[in-house]
Amino acid sequence: WIMGHMVNAIAQIDEFVNLGANSIETDVSFDKNANPEYTYHGIPCDCGRTCTKSEKFNVFLQGLQKATTPGDSKYQEKLVLVVFDLKSSSLYDNQASDAGKKLAKSLLQNYWKNGNNGGRAYIVLSIPNLAHYKLITGFKETLKTEGHPELMEKVGYDFSGNDDIDQVAKAYKKAGVTGHVWQSDGITNCLPRGLDRVKQAVANRDSSNGFINKVYYWTVDKRSTTRGALDAGVDGIMTNYPDVIADVLSESAYKSKFRIATYEDNPWETFKN
């Protein structure tokens, strides 16, 4: 999965997919009542990027729905996965459940169109704080209450705080999550970061009793870093330059080992050689 980083304006969806992304990451900011409000990152952000592009969250969802609904004039067949980077750190811990409930309602209405031919992309809820695990339970409960528990088949999870892998496992246990787990590791492109924790996550993914299904590394803009991440065995690379990642994937060392994921590739299944 080539994951376009910080796609917060509708116009950027086409821009990143046309450069080779089959997945995008979108920032979600919340108001003080835990309503998802804007697709917005803010300052500071990655070096070389504009930090302030934004849409109202529900408006962005409507644009995203068009981009991921077959038959729509804006349809982008290659776009199969969306990571919502939930900026829940602005909330109190006891608001996490509410944030999850409100997020579920927004998606149900504006993206899934209440189960009536909505967008088809798989969704990852990426949460920065292990203490906010109730965001997941609130989300799940709401889809159930609203009569669409089947949509949870399209939803996965990530804790993005670079926490100790054992602590991440405990948070999922509390949230009642088994499966659909993506594990991120990374840092802003302005700073270097080693691959030690990525390798730990990959080892968990590949062990018989691991809880991780997929591992992605962020934010990767250089060819050398891309090669390092691929050599470590990641499933996804988040980038500001999808064309750079696509280029490296076409190198002889990688093109026999990796291919770009399509809609037919289940993002919740651990890849077995």
From Swiss-Prot:
One of its GO terms (biological process) is lipid catabolic process. Disulfide bonds join C45-C51, C47-C190. It is an enzyme of class 4 (lyase). Binds 1 Mg(2+) ion per subunit. It is found in: Secreted. Its cofactor is Mg(2+). Keywords: Cytolysis, Dermonecrotic toxin, Disulfide bond, Hemolysis, Lipid degradation, Lipid metabolism, Lyase, Magnesium, Metal-binding, Secreted, Toxin. One of its GO terms (molecular function) is lyase activity. Mg(2+) binds at E25, D27, D85. The active site is at H5, H41. Its EC number is 4.6.1.-. Pfam families: GDPD_2. It catalyses: an N-(acyl)-sphingosylphosphocholine = an N-(acyl)-sphingosyl-1,3-cyclic phosphate + choline; an N-(acyl)-sphingosylphosphoethanolamine = an N-(acyl)-sphingosyl-1,3-cyclic phosphate + ethanolamine; a 1-acyl-sn-glycero-3-phosphocholine = a 1-acyl-sn-glycero-2,3-cyclic phosphate + choline; a 1-acyl-sn-glycero-3-phosphoethanolamine = a 1-acyl-sn-glycero-2,3-cyclic phosphate + ethanolamine. Dermonecrotic toxins cleave the phosphodiester linkage between the phosphate and headgroup of certain phospholipids (sphingolipid and lysolipid substrates), forming an alcohol (often choline) and a cyclic phosphate. This toxin acts on sphingomyelin (SM). It may also act on ceramide phosphoethanolamine (CPE), lysophosphatidylcholine (LPC) and lysophosphatidylethanolamine (LPE), but not on lysophosphatidylserine (LPS), and lysophosphatidylglycerol (LPG). It acts by transphosphatidylation, releasing exclusively cyclic phosphate products as second products. Belongs to the arthropod phospholipase D family. Class II subfamily. This is Dermonecrotic toxin LdSicTox-alphaIB3aii. It comes from Loxosceles deserta (Desert recluse spider).
